[in-house]
Amino acid sequence: MNPTAGTPSHNIDFWRDRPVLVTGATGLVGGWLVKSLLQAQADVVCLVRDWTPNAEIMRSGDLDRVNVVRGDICDQDCLERVLGEFEISTVMHLAAQTIVGIANRNPVSTFEANIGGTWKLMEACRRSPKVEQIVVASSDKAYGDAKVLPYTEDTPLAGMHPYDVSKSCGDLIAQTYANTYGLPVCVTRCGNFYGGGDLNWNRIIPGTIRSVIRGESPVIRSDGSFVRDYFYVEDGAAAYMHLAEQMAARPELNGEAFNLSTEIQVSVLELVDAILSEMGTSLKPVVRGEASHEIQHQYLDASKARNWLNWQPAFSLKKGLTRTIQWYHNYFQANQNPCNTTLPVGRAAAAA
């Protein structure tokens, strides 16, 4: 991977015809990862639970170029069958319930997917001798509300609320399969992903962009002071592939965790202002101050990934936002009523 290039490169010889299982392929990162794997000529298998027509992997036509297995990440028999029948070499585990609000309302289903799904996949991989690399997508939320910033990989995993706890547990389960059984696992912990293809309008970036395109003031559910680092989705997809390549060449990486981040701290209000500025609008956000059970301040130290993997993100926040905004402009232009030159008007999207 060329860390200074705008578009990360991959080892085509490594990926060509390689059987790769992607869980969570209909999600934001999963869709872009599948696109990158197809470009690298991998033989991609996607485990899909729900049929979501608006998912980027489906809208782009990429789903027609992969092997699709309808199944649930919590179905261990299904997982073992997929790993065996397709002779999977590399596993990219992205399947998860990722919405904090849903986790607070329905913790059991979140625990089943994020914790149960992880150990069932790890156990299926343990019983599948052809699996050579497993990349498990954890999250910065796995650290909980740690007081020492930035978070390093040595920061204890101490989630407090349902979503955070589910990521802490899944992370530790992946590590224990590496440490106890020698399973070839690495864990990634990323900041808040963003990019084209995210149609969850309750998220801060897509919700704000949609509001501006509709001529509406974006709504911030919190007081705007929450601080995060934001990680562009194409950087994430490239980093997962780069990590798998490194694991193949360096077995000593098994069991390691890596923070992936731009290491730039941005408050919600600063982020919204950056989007408004980039879109050239005079609209102002409506700040509701309603959000609860969310961590006030998080950002990651990615020096381990830089030093161990020779990795760094290709997209600055400005560059990523520019690319993302253009994607949404194209999306709404393609999906507006052809008999109406204006975009549909609705309520302003509430953002985190």
Language model features with spans:
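Conserved NAD(P)H cofactor-binding loop of Rossmann-fold oxidoreductase domains
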Residues: A95-T98, S138
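Catalytic helix-loop patch of NAD(P)-dependent Rossmann-fold dehydrogenases
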Residues: R105-K120, R127, Q133, A142-V187, ...
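N-terminal Rossmann-like NAD(P) cofactor-binding module of classical short-chain dehydrogenase/reductase
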Residues: S89-M92, V135
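Hydrophobic alpha-helix immediately C-terminal to the catalytic Tyr-X-X-X-Lys motif of short-chain
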Residues: C169, I173, Y177, T208, ...
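C-terminal substrate-binding subdomain of Rossmann-fold SDR/epimerase-dehydratase oxidoreductases
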Residues: M1-A5, Q39-A42, V212-A352
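Conserved sequence/active-site signature of Rossmann-fold short-chain dehydrogenase/reductase
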Residues: C74, T98, A142, C186, ...
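N-terminal Rossmann/SDR dinucleotide-binding element
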Residues: M1-T90
